[in-house]
Amino acid sequence: LIITMQNYQKYFPTFDNKGNITNEFLVVTNKQDKKGFIKLGNERVIEARLSDAEFFWFKDKSQNLVKKVSKLKSMNYFKGLGTYFDKVQRMRKLGGMLSDELLISKEKVELSASVCKVDLVSELVGEFPELQGIMGGYFAEAQGFEKDVSLAISEQYLPIGSESKIPKKAYSIASVSYTHLRAHE
């Protein structure tokens, strides 16, 4: 909701006193709107954008993440380094080694590594690229993946800056490690 409002429509979302988003937003315009046409037009636009997002969400979350891994073979990662599928295979290998050191399930780490980039081929992330990684975690949760795996997928890009939160769970740490140790690729 917030990304759609702020990044795409340049609206200001509003929040209640508990910090929850409300069903209202603010728009700045240089014209008076005595008849409410500007308000109505903006409401229609945001409703259409959110309807698209909802459609993509329901479609994408129903598609098996493991079965979509092969689609990464068609996405180039970086010249000379192969596809995202190739990257995921390297991440699985490194994650497996880290799992031994962290004394955590190798299977869970390898599973999270295997599917962590699959949201890149989802329609929702295609429409809202800034949700990559985040949506992968939500898709995994919606499909019944264990919480550790979903969280590792969601937190794979953390930290995103010096003020950003950092992962604290072992599976997320392994996820961050295999993402950031190979970031120089």
Walk through the language-model features, giving the residues of each.
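Short coil/turn segments at secondary-structure boundaries
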Residues: F56-V66, T83-V88, F128, L151-S154, ...
